[in-house]
Amino acid sequence: MTMPPPRPPRILVKRLAHAEGLALPAYQTAGAAGLDLAAALPHGTTLVLEPGGRHLLPTGFCLEIPEGYEAQVRPRSGLARKHGVTVLNTPGTIDADYRGEIGVILINMGDEPFEIVRGTRIAQLVVAPCVQAELIETHTLSDTERGEDGFGSTGHGSHQ
């Protein structure tokens, strides 16, 4: 007997005045993991993100994320591939107790200026369960095959 999928969390969304007329963040396909976030720039404004430049962009929305969940602001792959534009602090974590406007820090790693206007989809928001761990201080840790090796220590190249 298969169990029905768990009910997705409900997130309350507060629309700020500068987001009037913009669509709510939304999944673009039935299988999408992320809700698209759009720039809530003033009408008629074009923001030019120069190569190497970064800017904090408003989305015009605040969220009430349920306890036990978080949201991550992540890059849109098309912006990165086509223009070299990505989210600087990726992933940007939105905690369940944060109630301010969702902002997106974009950086242009490309060679050309990138223009952003009101409604440009600039990032995606992925909601996921999270837990707070209990840390217990100790003088020793259990041994593993890997041990203290890190940063590329598990190998290089292909697995042939």
Swiss-Prot record:
Enzyme class: hydrolase
Residues the record lists as binding substrate: 76-78, 89, 93-95
Record protein name field: Deoxyuridine 5'-triphosphate nucleotidohydrolase
Gene3D superfamilies (UniProt xref): 2.70.40.10
Family label: Belongs to the dUTPase family.
Pathway terms, separated by semicolons: Pyrimidine metabolism; dUMP biosynthesis; dUMP from dCTP (dUTP route): step 2/2
Comp. bias (Basic and acidic residues): 139-149
InterPro entries the record matches: dUTPase, dUTPase-like, dUTPase-like_sf, dUTPase_trimeric
Gene name per UniProt: dut
Upper taxonomic lineage: Bacteria, Pseudomonadati, Pseudomonadota, Alphaproteobacteria, Hyphomicrobiales
HAMAP family assigned to the protein according to its UniProt record, in alphabetical order: dUTPase_bact
